[in-house]
Amino acid sequence: MPVIPVDKPLGLTSHDVVNRARRARGTRRVGHTGTLDPLATGVLVLCVDDSTKLVQFMEADSKEYLAWIALGGTSPTLDAEGPLTEVVPVSPPSEEEARAVLAGFVGPQAQVPPQYSAIQVGGQRAYAVARAGGALDLPARNIVIHALELLGISNRMAESPRTFARSSEGWTPDPTGRTFTLPEPLGEFPTLLVRASVSSGTYLRSLARDVGAALGVPAHLAGLVRTRVGRYDLADSVSVEDLAGAEGFPNLAALDLPRMEADEPLARALRQGKRPRSAVVGRHVVTRDGELVAVVDGDGKELRVVRAWAGA
């Protein structure tokens, strides 16, 4: 069964998209590889039926985004949901200053998640506590920001580019390209347009907050488009309306792991959960005649099955 990258529209939760896929595909076995906030759009990777076994191997995939960071105002959710809770007058930073601040966030770091997030502490969801007027002490999480590229600075959100085309560098402002739908702005704030490549677990809302703090002003994420998840680009994604007939991608295309071809006895042993002897070291995808057999971990002596797939 396929892996289907979907272009999530503005306003839907990731669970909304999963439910629509279940109805469209006629199956309850649908999962996704990483939540996208309701006010964000872009790539949400769905795994259908037997492909749901892949989710655990895809959740750590790196992601790319276009992010609009509004300077001079913030909100409890750190995005355009509002309401504004702090507003200060601010002028746009220079390109030199903005680039220097962004460069300071590239690399491994500890990031504090937003209060409005699904993180659990002591059995409590952070967003549930926040909606009730409270706040949890959220521990910082280790993340990696691979790259942050400043694509533009605007005096206000309405002047920031919204039309983009894919290039060799990623999605780039292009008046002949595709126009993205973004949330209504909370105000007329100077806005940074940033292209970001980050590890799994990175909150772009937290990044917006922290970039603002580095510039000495409150800030929030005014818009977000996820343009890539692992191997899947926004250009490869289907609309929610086209889920029923979407062909998607085969399971093998989803796994960015070294591959090893098995003969029939080895394939059978792995599918039975056995631990055959092997000099292979590290995690590998095992195939047989182009079919996915298993994901295994090798210690140089034997193979341990992490996940196996039944033969055709």
Curated annotation (Swiss-Prot):
The active site is at residue 37. Keywords: Isomerase, tRNA processing. GO terms for molecular function: RNA binding; tRNA pseudouridine(55) synthase activity. The keyword Manganese does not apply. InterPro entries: PsdUridine_synth_cat_dom_sf, PsdUridine_synth_N, tRNA_psdUridine_synth_TruB, TruB_C. Pfam families: TruB_C_2, TruB_N. It catalyses: uridine(55) in tRNA = pseudouridine(55) in tRNA. It is an enzyme of class 5 (isomerase). Signal peptide: none annotated. Transmembrane segments: none annotated. GO terms for biological process: mRNA pseudouridine synthesis; tRNA pseudouridine synthesis. Its EC number is 5.4.99.25. Belongs to the pseudouridine synthase TruB family. Type 1 subfamily. Responsible for synthesis of pseudouridine from uracil-55 in the psi GC loop of transfer RNAs. This is tRNA pseudouridine synthase B.
